Design a protein with these regions (language model features):
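Sec-dependent signal peptide recognition
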Residues: 1-9
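Hydrophobic h-region of N-terminal signal peptides that target proteins for export
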Residues: 8-16
Length: 466
């Protein structure tokens, strides 16, 4: 670990330094802390940096001056991550030109681009770091052995972000199980979950969410799709709702990677989930409230709410939906319709494949995986502009975040594009870390925590020494 110490002009209150889950407490990563930095590099505005062994695309979470994150260490070599969203398509096209049959093509693709369970032996860890110094307080191994399923090298074996209530940390890894630890690293309980096949061994990614005394997960896979609630005190399953969505024959897509959302609105509190081709909302006992067709076959962006509306990204080539509280039944739009009694508006061409949009200062900022950046009025759905961040912007998986009148877009090469908030597109600067990046950052008071493939950084604005 290396770190730099300097004097600061102010001290963040502990309450402002809580980041309890993926994309923050409100699932919309913004902050009003004016001390947060908008410039950084591997040497600039670095409070500390800590090497994190292994690999994981899970985000850091923060509570009571501690950072928690997961990683997986592989015995021997692990296949290097892939940038972009080509996946294996180009490779398949090359093999087809060689005249290979389908069976041989699939064998070569799996050998090059996937890690299968029999190929790797893994050790899964939960790390606890000190927020002020980056020092590792403790680490706990919570699973080991061959994984229950494989992964594409675009994914990791720990892409799910833990969640905390300030008393315990709840770690969910798809097809492995749920684990609970106290803040001193003592394991409180462990609940295995069944291992179900994911489409083409792409791996899992949907994080858990927490409300009251319950932990909620969604598992959209090829065999037994379900949403479930568990008692956070014991790990026992409280309810399970089977989901029959997506394609139903052969090996067609029934898997998804979307984190669910607890929507506390003026009518009720509900669990919003997005699966293949269909979004479904449940009450907190697992009863279906409403459903919406028209979602992509392989959804990834997460739903979230602000300003009284729920925003649901339908995926690449699909609409962005704004949904009113109190919906019931099938709220799917009719042919050619852009709104109905439950849907306030849709913007038909604004769905994206990977990053989740961010809502900031009355607008939605939508980032596509190839660097196309859009601003949409959050109340009306009117498109303000659509622009390319840069001719060489690269590829994006991380969701954008916002503060101090700026939107931040981190690409997979470690470059962050800083865009001015407002009705005109203006790229202010880029910040370069020169390290592969797939994890969404955390904002903890006046600290920005960014996880790259090898390192966790704490960025904090320097001030003059006293």
């Amino acid at each position: 670990m290396r770190f730099t110490v300097w004097f600061l002009s102010g001290v963040a209150l502990l309450g402002a330094a809580e980041w309890p889950q993926f994309r923050g407490a409100e699932s919309n990563p913004i902050s009003a802390d004016t001390r947060l930095p908008d410039k950084w590099s591997a040497t600039e505005n670095v409070e500390w940096s800590t090497a994190v062994p292994g690999r994981g695309w899970s985000s850091p979470i923060v509570s009571k001056g501690r950072i928690f994150l997961t990683t997986v260490v592989t015995d021997g070599e692990s296949k290097k991550p892939q940038t972009g969203t080509e996946y294996s398509n180009q490779y398949v096209a090359e093999l087809q030109k060689q005249g290979l049959d389908e069976k041989e093509i699939m064998a070569r693709v799996m050998a090059r681009d996937f890690e299968l369970p029999h190929e790797v032996n893994l050790r899964y860890f939960l790390y606890c770091l000190d927020l002020a110094t980056g020092a590792v307080r403790w680490k706990r191994e919570f699973h080991s052995g061959h994984p229950p399923g494989g992964r594409h090298r675009k994914n990791s074996f720990t892409s799910e972000t833990p969640v905390t209530d300030g008393s315990a940390i709840y770690v969910y890894t798809g097809n492995v199980g749920l684990h609970a630890f106290d803040f001193d690293g003592k394991q409180l309980w462990r609940t295995p979950v069944e291992a179900n096949p994911i489409y083409l061994e792409f791996g899992t990614a949907a994080s858990p969410v927490l409300h009251g005394d319950r932990i909620f997960i969604v598992s959209d896979n090829q065999e037994r799709q379900y949403a479930a609630a568990f008692d956070k005190r014991t790990g026992k399953q409280v309810w399970r709702a089977n989901r029959d969505i997506g394609e139903t024959t052969g090996s067609r897509m029934r898997s998804a990677w979307t984190t669910p959302y607890i929507w506390k609105n003026k009518v009720r509190t509900e669990l919003v989930t997005v699966g293949p081709k269909t979004a479904i909302s449940y009450d907190l006992e697992g009863k279906e409230l409403w459903r919406l067709n028209g979602v992509a076959a392989s959804p990834i962006p997460s739903p979230f709410a602000t300003g009284g509306l729920l925003y649901l990204n339908g995926g690449r080539g699909k609409p962005l939906f704004a949904i009113r509280p109190g919906a019931t039944g099938d709220i799917t739009l009719g042919e050619g319709a852009r709104s109905n009694v439950s849907i306030a508006w849709t913007e038909r061409r604004s769905g994206v494949y990977l990053p989740t949009p961010v809502a900031y200062e009355g607008a939605l900022y939508v980032l596509g995986e190839t660097g196309i950046f859009s601003r949409i009025d959050a109340a009306t759905g009117k498109l303000t502009y659509r622009a390319r961040l840069d001719d060489n912007a690269g590829s994006f998986t991380v969701s954008p975040w916002a503060y101090n009148g700026r939107i931040f877009c981190l690409n997979e090469d470690g470059r962050t594009f800083v865009v001015a908030a407002g009705e005109e597109f203006q790229l202010l600067r880029t910040n370069d870390l020169d390290d592969f990046s797939m994890a969404s950052p955390a904002i903890a008071g006046d600290r920005l925590l960014v996880r790259t493939e090898s390192t966790l950084y704490s960025f904090r604005t320097r001030s003059a020494p006293k």
